[in-house]
């Protein structure tokens, strides 16, 4: 029997501190990463600690809607 392809989905992670603080005055932009998640194992929105080149530090990146 064939497996369903809808289990793994692509998600976009966006820096929460850049969005909250407006954008850094030195360089404009918001850090975004693209990754995949398994909907069965992780039904809640994904949050990972990643490096933000605009904040120059590791910050929490949260899943956003497409």
Curated annotation (Swiss-Prot):
GO terms of molecular function: structural constituent of ribosome
Gene: rpl33
Protein name: Large ribosomal subunit protein bL33c
Compartment(s) where it occurs, according to its Swiss-Prot or TrEMBL record: Plastid, Chloroplast
One Pfam entry name: Ribosomal_L33
UniProt keyword list: Chloroplast, Plastid, Ribonucleoprotein, Ribosomal protein
Family designation: Belongs to the bacterial ribosomal protein bL33 family.
Chain segments annotated as coiled-coil in the UniProt record: none
Source domain of life: Eukaryota
Primary location group: plastid
Organism placement in taxonomy: Eukaryota, Viridiplantae, Streptophyta, Embryophyta, Tracheophyta
Signal peptide positions on this chain: none
GO BP of this protein: translation
PANTHER family associated with the record: 50S RIBOSOMAL PROTEIN L33, CHLOROPLASTIC, LARGE RIBOSOMAL SUBUNIT PROTEIN BL33C
Cellular component GO terms, alphabetical: chloroplast; ribonucleoprotein complex; ribosome
């Amino acid at each position: 029997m064939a497996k369903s392809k809808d289990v793994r989905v692509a998600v976009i992670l966006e820096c929460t501190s850049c969005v909250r603080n407006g954008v850094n005055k030195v360089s404009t932009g918001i850090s975004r990463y693209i990754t995949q998640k398994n909907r069965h194992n992780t039904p809640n929105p994904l949050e990972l600690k990643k490096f933000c080149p605009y904040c120059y530090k590791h910050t929490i990146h949260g899943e956003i809607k497409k």
